[in-house]
Swiss-Prot record:
Species, as recorded: Plasmodium berghei (strain Anka)
GO BP of this protein: proteolysis
Gene that encodes the chain: SERA3
Any one cellular-component term (Gene Ontology): symbiont-containing vacuole
Keyword 4Fe-4S: no
CDD domains: Peptidase_C1 (cd02619)
Protein's name in the database: Serine-repeat antigen protein 3
Length: 1096
């Protein structure tokens, strides 16, 4: 509560005390109420001559205190980021009725030469803005070159600016360094970055501001060194600014690479503690121009808006002759299929728990009613505007002829009727019966503890005949719906056994949300007689024998196969002087297409994307990717973990090679082993046997050819049928041919963590690189006494490893998090083969290093296959799910900006104090001289036509008393089903996301979650036609920003029912998650007149 009050106080300061020297005018507000599910909005309007006057203050009667921004015709910017105070908002009735403009022309329109508003816009009288003393305020400097401006005396603030810009902020680079090859620069860069001092203490309220440019499609950013920001030119480019290390990168969405600002020449302006930066980015004549300057900031940098603008103006008009003071890069863009439509600027302030997104609309290229839909989606914090846009059109029952459909993929319009029927159809009766049974059990297993004021689990004393009957019915339904037959031939428990098993699982996951508990109660292990033996049959790793010196000599004397393409690339040899000359023309303009081409050479297969990059990787979050179609496997009651880990690894390699996803047959590999059925199912093995079987048989059929059921493991290898597909084909096993001393392993490479004990960062970087290149890595871990049927999986576990691993899994991704102690750390995302309902949707997370006192790392060994794969006979037909990772132009069809689920978490993490984390954008390391083979230790209002405004979970920001926060955040009459460990009081008052931190547990211990719970307020600003509208979304946990969905964004037409809508979302998400539009599905199930789930 203290932190919540702190957030409110700071926001009040931000909105009430941020003085801006521009005009202030009065304009009607729009939006829902602030009591929950609505939006406070702030409308910013420009006058004909860019001047206006202040009229009144924000108050509870509904009047809004608004601040107009300078008219871009008179100044360099059409908007500033100064915040204004807010009162409670009015209704939408005050807004003019939406009109349907003509269809936008395909070409990029130029900015209007006059700032006079159109007839449909409110026009305010032309008045000269005056200061408190009555003096006129001179217009801000023009964006045009100085020669076109009327000379005027230099003011004192201008003198400060000129003085700040005149002195270079960092030592100049010598001519010798300027002429040095890129290879040399790349070698020097890491060491320079590593020696940097901690960044300066940034301003508690403001550490960065952004402004829209007048004459070009672009923005200006000014801030203190140490901030991490991003600028997105939708729908084509994303720019990264990691100012701590003076790193700027460009990521074209039409290609999966990142281009470094220092690609051609070293950056001269280096950020340092106590310094500030100015960054200009805009597009002119199909040329992307970036300008970067570091300077000593004046004391009134953010207190006086004029100072910031003058500094930015001075940087923006830098000529080529002055490039020695300002770093300038120009990139010729390839031919794009549509113009730039908007620019987003993203920043974070971890000290205040704030995220801010500004959305600048560049041109009116979309009809007004369509624009309102996208604006509402944005103001509710959606990371995928397109999905929200689809949902809104479906809820509005829009006809296929509706003009808004032209901004969505054609598949939705073509399949509109089918989509609607799917949402209206009934679920399978047995499936519904199981969901109902689980709901009854969850309600039965918790009782209100009046003394502790919370819900607590029942005990055996509360066991009765009603519960006994429901437990029997529950397991009966589970067995009938168990397509993997894991309960077949198994000894089922009686009602007492089931009660104890379920009670243990609920204790271990005591703080899990109800939605996740629904999934966990689908785990068939709960119905077993002896649940402790459940995991024993699922382990099955036997380490291969150590390679002897004789075997090493034999391997080195054999004729080697071709090397893996990943090993052929020496990163430092990719860029020589001749190649660089071809990239830059005589005018110093870099050809982006050629720069992209060379950047791709860093890996033949890896494409950097918002779903997998150097900081974060989870390709399963990208629902259009090939890899996301690889399902979680259930190995059943056989010790075949080694087989399923190898199978998944092979399938991700196929996706990364562009051959598409065809599910391979695990049963074929199991039955073609030269062992008996009992030995195969009970004794276990390792990935080397997987490769030996395939290399010998030269065949691997589809799962549909020879489907897997654990009870069908027989030890009898089938004869391939004529209609079977061979996924193995002419695949070759390659030698590991890394540089330096090594043991040659044929078909695989082994990384043992014990040999990296003195340099675990190298081990971690190697595994991350392999995941980026091959989609996954096979890993050996210890599960006995640590991981069992009740393991949580959603929360990051901090566990040690063991010298004798017993299980094989796949590392499929990684990411960063902030620990309870405030330390920046990283985790592995691991996939198991124990079914979708184990862990968290079949996966779990572990800290990459584990506790400080660990003798062994949690990852005992990592293995990757080294194979030269050829496409199978069916890889070019419609049966194979193509690799959308390598068909990025298909994703570019989206009109709206799309972000990954990790986008805001990454933004916050990189701004989090400490800054000690490794840069997420730096290039791969050169591991050529490392021994990696294991022999050395040196190594979101109208029910009929809903157009609600942004979700509001904060107080009226024009009035700042603390009690208003309680009014805005709570509804005393609202009812909610609390999570198991939530107090009754907290549940009643909660109107935000319950992203509870749960226990990272084991079968024998119930350790607390190691991840810090951080409350976040997301401020969203939509700027269009010189008007600004604000939205607010509050998250109880930073991790909520990482989810594909969050029920906190559920919208209620009656604010009193917000908690009810949120609860409905949590309880029914599992039914709708696979629908074309889950939000539409939920809205249809709930009834369209009550809740709206398009923003979820």
């Amino acid at each position: 509560m203290a932190r919540l009050s702190s957030i409110v106080f700071i926001i009040c300061l931000l909105l009430c005390n941020n003085a801006i020297s521009d005009e202030v005018i009065e304009s009607p507000s729009s939006g829902g109420t602030l009591s929950g599910g609505g939006s406070g909005t702030d409308t910013v309007t420009g006058t004909q001559d860019g001047k206006g006057k202040s009229e009144g203050k924000g108050n509870e009667g509904g009047q809004t205190d608004q601040k107009g921004k300078e008219n871009p015709e008179n100044g360099q910017n059409s908007d500033s980021t100064g915040d204004s105070s807010l009162g409670s908002t009015g209704s939408n009735g005050s807004q003019p009725a939406p009109t349907t403009p003509k269809e936008p022309e395909p070409t990029t329109p130029k900015e209007p030469e006059s700032a006079t508003p159109k007839a449909s816009e409110p026009v305010t009288p032309q008045k000269t803005a005056e200061t408190a003393s009555g003096k006129q305020v001179s217009p801000t400097p023009s964006e045009n070159p100085p020669s076109k401006d009327t000379p005027k005396p230099e003011s004192s603030s201008e003198k400060k600016v000129n003085s700040a810009l005149a002195t270079p902020p960092a030592p100049e680079v010598s001519k010798a360094q300027e002429g040095a090859g890129l290879a040399t620069q790349k070698e020097q860069t890491p060491s320079k970055r590593a020696k940097r001092s901690p960044p300066p203490q940034v301003n508690n309220i403001t550490d960065m501001e952004s402004y829209l440019m007048k004459n070009y499609d672009g923005v200006k950013v000014i801030g203190l060194c140490g901030v991490y920001f991003r600028v997105q030119f939708s729908p084509h480019l994303l720019l990264y600014g990691l100012t701590t290390f003076s790193i700027i990168q460009i990521e074209p969405f039409f290609e999966g690479v990142r281009i470094d600002f220092e690609h051609q020449h070293p950056i001269r302006n280096k950020c340092a503690p106590g310094k500030a930066f100015a960054f200009i980015s805009y597009v002119k004549d199909n040329i992307l121009i970036l300008k970067w300057k570091v300077f000593a900031p004046p004391s009134d940098l953010f207190a006086n808006d004029e100072v910031s603008k003058q500094i930015l103006s001075a940087v923006s008009v830098t000529s080529d002759a002055e490039s020695s003071v300002v770093d300038v890069r120009k990139y010729r863009l390839p031919q794009l299929d549509r113009p730039f439509t908007s620019i987003q600027v993203y920043k974070a302030n971890p000290k205040q728990g704030l995220l801010e997104t500004k959305n600048y609309i560049l041109k009116n290229a979309i009809p007004e009613k369509c624009s309102k839909i996208s604006m509402n989606c944005f103001l509710n914090g959606n990371v995928n505007i397109e999905n929200c846009f689809k949902c809104t059109l479906l809820v509005q029952n829009a006809k296929p002829t509706d003009e808004c459909f032209q901004y969505l993929p054609s598949d939705m319009k073509n399949n509109l009727n089918e989509i609607k029927v799917t949402a209206q159809s009934d679920e399978d009766s047995k499936e519904n019966d199981l969901i109902e049974s689980i709901e009854i059990l969850l309600n039965s297993f918790y009782k209100a503890d009046k003394k502790a004021k919370k819900l607590s689990l029942i005990t055996m004393d509360d066991f009765d005949d009603v519960l006994r009957a429901e437990l029997f019915n529950y397991c009966k339904l589970l067995k009938e719906l168990d397509t993997k037959k894991t309960l077949e031939n198994a000894e089922l428990g009686n009602e007492i056994d089931i009660f104890n098993n379920l009670l243990r699982l609920l204790k271990t996951n005591e703080e899990e949300s109800k939605h996740n508990l629904y999934k966990k109660l689908r785990n068939t292990a709960i119905c077993l007689k002896d649940v402790n033996k459940w995991a024993e049959k699922k382990r099955g790793l036997i380490l291969p024998e150590e390679v002897t010196q004789d075997q090493m000599a034999i391997g080195q004397n054999e004729e080697p196969y071709d090397e893996d393409p990943d090993d052929r690339v020496d990163l430092l040899e990719l860029f020589d002087d001749n190649q660089n000359e071809n990239i830059v023309d005589k005018d110093g303009i870099i050809d982006m297409s050629i720069a992209i081409k060379y950047a791709k050479l860093k890996s033949p297969y890896f494409n950097s994307s918002k779903y997998c990059n150097y900081e974060y990787c989870d390709r399963w979050q990208d629902k259009t990717s090939c890899i996301s179609n690889i399902d979680v496997e259930e190995q059943g009651n056989c010790s075949l973990c080694w087989l399923f880990a190898s199978k998944l690894h092979l399938e991700t390699i196929r996706c990364m090679r562009g051959y598409g996803h065809n599910r391979s047959s695990a049963l074929y590999v199991a039955n073609c082993s030269k062992r008996t059925a009992e030995e195969i199912c009970n004794d276990g093995s390792n990935p080397l046997e997987f490769l030996k079987i395939l290399e010998k048989n030269k065949f691997l059929p589809l799962e549909s050819n020879y489907p897997y059921l654990w009870k069908n493991v027989s030890g009898k290898c089938p004869n391939p049928q004529n209609d079977w597909t061979n996924l193995w084909g002419n695949t070759k096993l390659l030698y590991n041919n890394m540089f330096g001393q090594f043991i040659k392993h044929r078909g695989y490479i082994v990384y043992s963590s014990r040999f990296f004990a003195k340099n675990m960062n190298v081990f971690i970087d190697i595994i991350k690189r392999e995941i980026r290149n091959k989609g996954s890595v096979i890993a050996y871990i210890k599960t006995q006494g640590v991981i069992d049927y009740d393991f949580n999986g959603r929360y990051i576990s901090n566990i040690c490893g063991h010298n004798h691993p017993d299980h094989a899994v796949n590392i499929i991704g990684y990411g960063n998090y902030i620990s309870e102690s405030g330390e920046k750390r990283s985790y592995w995302l691991i996939r198991n083969s124990w079914g979708y309902y184990w862990g968290h949707e079949g996966n779990f997370k572990v800290d990459v290093l584990g506790p400080d006192n660990c003798v062994h790392n949690v990852i005992h060994t990592a293995i990757v296959f080294k194979i030269d794969m050829e496409p199978d006979s069916d890889s070019n037909n419609n049966n194979a799910i193509k690799n959308r990772d390598q068909l990025i132009d298909e994703d570019n069809k989206s009109y709206f900006p799309q972000l990954s689920s990790n986008f805001y978490h990454s933004l916050y993490y990189n701004n989090y104090e400490g800054y000690e984390a490794k840069n997420d954008d730096e290039n791969d390391q050169n591991y050529g001289n490392l021994d990696v083979s294991g022999q050395s230790e040196n190594h979101q209002n109208d029910p009929k036509n809903p157009q609600p405004q942004a979700n509001s979970t904060v107080t009226q920001l024009g009035v700042c008393p603390a009690e208003n926060q309680r009014t805005a955040d709570s509804n005393p009459n609202a009812q909610s089903t609390p999570s198991p460990n939530t107090t009754v009081t907290d549940t009643v008052n909660s109107n935000t996301a319950n992203s509870n931190t749960a226990n990272s547990n084991t079968a024998s211990a119930n350790a607390a979650s190691i991840e810090k719970k951080i409350q976040i307020l997301h401020v969203l600003k939509h700027i269009e036609k010189y008007k600004m509208t604000r939205g607010f979304v509050k998250y109880d946990n930073l991790n909520d920003t990482k989810n594909d969905y969050t029920c906190a964004r559920s919208y209620s037409y009656d604010p009193k029912n917000h908690n009810e809508c949120k609860q409905f979302c949590e309880e029914n998400w599992e039914r709708c998650k696979n629908h074309y539009s889950p939000g539409y599905c939920l809205t249809t199930l709930s009834g369209k007149n009550k809740c709206l789930f398009c923003y979820v």
